[in-house]
């Protein structure tokens, strides 16, 4: 009898257990639902309205300046840029075996936050960055040295020997250092319009890779040479590329190499390594990195030689035969988005009649309001556990550190040639604070002497922030 009763109790206990598990499951779903609802309730109507108005302004800008592109708004943050029907997409992606798409989706809120952030960034690799970044010398430094012979800098002295010749102690360049800058691409359409004098009128000119500067192309691309961003392959020809200018700053996009160092020790030009995040969307290539570099130093960035006609079949260059490039339609769409976000100004033969007419681009005031609203929106949607203390200009600082109070070593090595030792290659590193443009000095004070760097390989808003003493007389 007792055995029979025990047998009846067992299914009953199992049933009660199932009910309990189901109740917990339902409670979890409800909690998640209400948590999501509460997160949505964090969205402020005024912020949504500001961002919606900004989207409408961007849409109108694309309609006026997009040369056939159109913007289709999804919500207050997302839109799609579409090429017109009938656009001949001839760019074939052999890896995925598809032709390039004719429409691209972008999150404008994220784009505004990212590109406004570059206006406060340091985009040159420095010793202070490696000192402050967690495992900066052990891990990251090794990633920037080709053929090191190890995956990490177990021997820091050896790694320093590789980097010293191009590693300044602190940022050699500063936000707001120049007012108006030109970034000159390599597109063949540069030969359609004589932009040379206009390009040379800028405070600083940025060029890419091996693009020549000579009398043959002077009326098209100018002759002014201030900065040049090069990929690893072009860096192998740096002596030839830099010939004719002792002051042009060479910035290597990827890694250094012992062969590069031997060449650097023989030339009078400043040479540094680029430091910046790898974009997962948007246009790819050196041109985009040149824009990042320019934006970290300049108020206004004008770009030339980046325009591509929808449907073209070859990646043309103004100084050589066509060659294979990458994602022209995606690049064209993304550059247009950047112009309508106030990041760049596009110059091309197709726009010669619209010269200096930027009235359809959202104003700095509207962009600033959209940036503030996007920042509040971003932080309201972050899980409580991931939110950091602080807000404002330092709210995205993930890692903090202090710069060495001493001035620190300038880039270089004892075995440099007499040509380099007697040159002015370190002029940017030793430039007195009082010699900076007033806007750059004011920005430095506003930032309380803090340098901000991107944390490569992490989230877009994770920064390494380094404090400097506010010694304004140095």
Swiss-Prot record:
PANTHER family: SIALYLTRANSFERASE-LIKE PROTEIN 1. It is a single-pass type II membrane protein. Signal peptide: none annotated. InterPro entries: Glyco_trans_29, GT29-like_sf, SIA1/STLP5. Pfam families: Glyco_transf_29 (PF00777). The lineage of its organism: Eukaryota, Viridiplantae, Streptophyta, Embryophyta, Tracheophyta. Required for normal pollen grain germination and pollen tube growth. May not be required for pollen development and female gametophytic function. The gene is SIA1. Residues 1-14 are cytoplasmic. Belongs to the glycosyltransferase 29 family. Glycans are attached at residues 88, 120, 155, 243. This is Sialyltransferase-like protein 1. Residues 376-421 are annotated as: Disordered. It is found in: Golgi apparatus membrane. Keywords: Glycoprotein, Glycosyltransferase, Golgi apparatus, Membrane, Signal-anchor, Transferase, Transmembrane, Transmembrane helix. It comes from the Eukaryota. Its main location: Golgi. The chain crosses the membrane at residues 15-35. Highly expressed in inflorescences and siliques and at lower levels in roots, leaves and stems. It comes from Arabidopsis thaliana. GO terms for molecular function: sialyltransferase activity. Disruption phenotype: Inhibition of pollen germination and retarded pollen tube growth. Residues 36-474 are lumenal. GO terms for biological process: pollen germination; pollen tube growth; protein glycosylation.
């Amino acid at each position: 009898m007792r055995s029979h009763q025990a047998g009846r109790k067992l299914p009953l206990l199992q049933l009660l257990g199932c009910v309990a598990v189901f109740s917990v499951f339902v409670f979890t779903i409800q909690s998640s639902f209400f948590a999501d609802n509460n997160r949505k309730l964090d969205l402020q109507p005024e912020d949504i309205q500001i961002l919606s108005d900004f989207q409408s302004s961007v849409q109108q800008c694309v309609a006026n300046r997009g040369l056939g592109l159109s913007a289709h708004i999804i919500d207050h943050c997302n839109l799609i840029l579409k090429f017109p029907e009938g656009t001949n997409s001839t760019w074939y992606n052999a890896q995925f075996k598809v032709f390039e798409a004719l429409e691209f989706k972008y999150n404008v809120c994220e784009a505004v936050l990212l590109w406004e952030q570059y206006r406060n960034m340091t985009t040159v690799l420095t010793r202070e960055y490696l000192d402050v970044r967690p495992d900066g010398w052990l891990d990251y430094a090794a990633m920037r040295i080709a053929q090191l012979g190890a995956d990490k800098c177990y021997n820091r002295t050896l790694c320093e020997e590789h980097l010293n010749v191009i590693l300044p102690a602190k940022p050699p360049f500063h936000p707001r250092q120049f007012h108006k800058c030109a970034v000159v691409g390599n597109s063949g359409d540069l030969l359609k319009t004589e932009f040379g004098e206009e390009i040379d009128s800028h405070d600083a000119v940025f060029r890419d890779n091996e693009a020549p500067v000579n009398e043959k192309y002077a009326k098209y691309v100018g002759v002014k040479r201030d900065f040049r961003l090069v990929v690893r392959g072009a860096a192998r020809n740096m002596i030839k590329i830099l010939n004719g200018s002792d002051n042009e700053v060479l910035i290597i996009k990827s890694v250094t190499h012992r062969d590069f160092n031997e060449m650097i020790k023989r030339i009078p030009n400043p040479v540094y390594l680029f430091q910046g995040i790898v974009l997962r969307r948007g246009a790819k290539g050196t041109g985009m990195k040149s824009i990042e570099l320019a934006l970290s130093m300049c108020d206004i960035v004008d770009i030339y030689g980046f325009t591509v006609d929808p449907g073209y079949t070859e990646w043309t260059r103004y100084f050589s035969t066509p060659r294979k490039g990458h994602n022209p339609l995606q690049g064209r769409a993304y550059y247009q988005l950047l112009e309508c976000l106030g990041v760049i100004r596009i110059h091309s033969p197709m726009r010669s009649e619209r010269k200096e007419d930027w009235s359809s681009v959202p104003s700095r005031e509207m962009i600033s309001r959209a940036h503030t609203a996007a920042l509040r929106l971003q932080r309201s949607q972050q899980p409580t556990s991931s939110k950091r203390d602080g807000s404002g200009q330092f709210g995205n600082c993930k890692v903090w550190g202090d710069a060495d109070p001493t001035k620190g070593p300038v880039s270089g090595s004892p075995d440099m040639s007499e040509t380099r030792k007697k040159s002015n290659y370190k002029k940017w590193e030793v430039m007195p604070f009082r010699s900076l443009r007033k806007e750059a000095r004011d920005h430095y004070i506003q930032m309380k002497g803090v340098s901000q760097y991107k944390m490569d390989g992490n989230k877009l808003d994770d920064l390494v922030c380094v404090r400097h003493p506010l010694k304004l007389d140095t």
